[in-house]
């Protein structure tokens, strides 16, 4: 699990992207 891993939540935050592991809306 690295910073640039787009399949992890931390990777999403580092890359500034969203997806299954990092939804835009807060539940």
From Swiss-Prot:
Coiled-coil segments on the chain, per record: none
InterPro entries named among the record's database cross-references: Ribosomal_bTHX, Ribosomal_bTHX/bTHXc/bTHXm
Keywords: Ribonucleoprotein, Ribosomal protein, RNA-binding, rRNA-binding
Ranges annotated as biased composition (Basic residues): 1-13
Chain spans, region Disordered: 1-27
The organism's place on the tree of life at top rank: Bacteria
A GO molecular-function descriptor: rRNA binding
Cytoplasm in keyword set: no
One GO CC annotation: ribonucleoprotein complex
Signal peptide: none
Any Pfam family matching the protein: Thx
Its biological purpose: Binds at the top of the head of the 30S subunit. It stabilizes a number of different RNA elements and thus is important for subunit structure.
Quaternary data: Part of the 30S ribosomal subunit.
Record family assignment: Belongs to the bacterial ribosomal protein bTHX family.
Protein name in the entry: Small ribosomal subunit protein bTHX
Organism for this UniProt entry: Thermus thermophilus (strain ATCC 27634 / DSM 579 / HB8)
């Amino acid at each position: 699990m690295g910073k640039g891993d787009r399949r992890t939540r931390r990777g999403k935050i580092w890359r500034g992207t969203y997806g299954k592991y990092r939804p835009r809306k807060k539940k």
